Swiss-Prot record:
Part of a proton relay during catalysis (site feature) positions: T55, Y118
Name of the protein in question: 4-hydroxy-tetrahydrodipicolinate synthase
Keyword vocabulary terms for this entry: Amino-acid biosynthesis, Cytoplasm, Diaminopimelate biosynthesis, Lyase, Lysine biosynthesis, Schiff base
Family label: Belongs to the DapA family.
Amino acid sequence: MIPNNTQFSNPIFGRILTAMVTPFKENGGVDYELAIKLANHLCENGSDGIVLCGTTGESPTLSWDEQHNLFVAVKSSLNSRSKVIVGTGSNCTSEAIEATKKAYEFGADGALVVVPYYNKPPQEGLYNHFSSIATAASDLPLMLYNIPGRTGCNLLPTTVNKLMNFPNILSIKAASGRIEEVTELRAACGPKLFIYSGDDSLLLPMLSVGAVGVVSVASHIVGLQLKMMIESFQKGEFSIALDIHEKLQPLFKALFETTNPIPIKAALELTGWQVGSPRNPLTPLIKEKKDNLFQIIQNLSL
C-alpha cells in the first residue's frame, strides 16, 4: 500500500534506517540466527527500520537464495515492529524488476534500488530503468539510491523529478558526498521527496537543508546517539545536535577509512558482535586501523 506523501514531518520509513551487515559463520555461510538477533537489537536501540542486502550487507557476494532467506528470517522476527527494506538493485533491469517483485510478494516494506553500476546508462536509460521497476512493483514503496562513487553514474535531480510521477517512488538515499545534492533535489522535486543522507558524517548538515533522516552504518553501534541528534535538531536544540555530531565525527571517519563494510564489521566485533569477516574479495580490517577504531570506541564509552 502506497501512503499519501503529504506529511513531510512523517517520513515513510522513519528517520534512522540501519544498513545492516550480513553476519557470516566461520564456514562462510550466512548466520541467519545472528542476523535476527542483530536486527532486533538495532530496532531496540534507535533504528526505525533495517535495510538488508545493500552495500553494507555485501549484496554483491550474496546469492539470490541467501538474500531471500535473510529477508524472510529478519522480517518474520521483526514482524510489523520495524520497517524492513530490501536492496533489489541491479545493473540489469530485468533482474532488478524480478527481485523487486519478489520483495513485494514476500512482504517487504520497501525496496532500495541502486543506480545501475558499471554499464553507466545516460539519464534516459536511468529513467527507463527505474520507471520499469516502479511499474512492475507498483504497490511497493521505492527508495532510489544514488551513489556515484560506486556506480560511476550520477542520477540527476531532473531525472528524479520525472520519476516522481510514479506514486511509489517516494524517497532517495543521497550518497554522492555532496551536501548540495539535497538542495538540488529539493529545488527539482519539492518537499514531497523524502531525502535520506547516505553518509553519517553529513547527516546534520543535510538535515539543515531538507533531508529527513539517514540510511546509516554508524547506527549499528551509536543508534541512540543519532536518534538524540535528530530529535535535538527537530526541537531546535541545535547546540546539542552539533555537540553530538562533533563527538561522533572520529567514529564516522574511522568507519570509512577503508571500504565499507570492512570497518563496521570490525567495530561490531569490538563491541561484542561476532559477525564474521567480509566475504572475498573484501578483507578484514588491518591491525593499525582496528587499533585506532578500538581507541575511538573506548573514548565514546561504547
